[in-house]
UniProtKB/Swiss-Prot annotation:
The gene is IL3. The keyword Glycoprotein applies. This is Interleukin-3. PANTHER family: INTERLEUKIN-3. It comes from the Eukaryota. It comes from Macaca mulatta. Disulfide bonds join 35-103.
Amino acid sequence: MSRLPVLLLLHLLVSPGLQAPMTQTTSLKTSWAKCSNMIDEIITHLNQPPLPSPDFNNLNEEDQTILVEKNLRRSNLEAFSKAVKSLQNASAIESILKNLPPCLPMATAAPTRPPIRITNGDRNDFRRKLKFYLKTLENEQAQ
């Protein structure tokens, strides 16, 4: 008996035409699930002691505007990635931030203003702004 029919059958079984198709929606949902897990992990790290002062959640309007601007998402992530290096015990957050760029939406135009400013070594400033930034990403995906 020839091996040709067996090889042909094997080829048909592994060809993409016979496998369940992966839609773009399925792929995006899976990708976003990974992104959401990374965001949750960062927030868990941010919620660990030392805890911030009572006025922690006060984020000025200009910072909020910068953090929600879609064209600044990548620039803001770069600012957080640089700022995390000046914090103690933040290596876990730093490594997750490195994996976050694929989760960001594509910018539709060049940024019109500079990215967010984070006070060097100020864990509360970093935490407050990063939490707002991450929540913005989550809220946008939920829409």
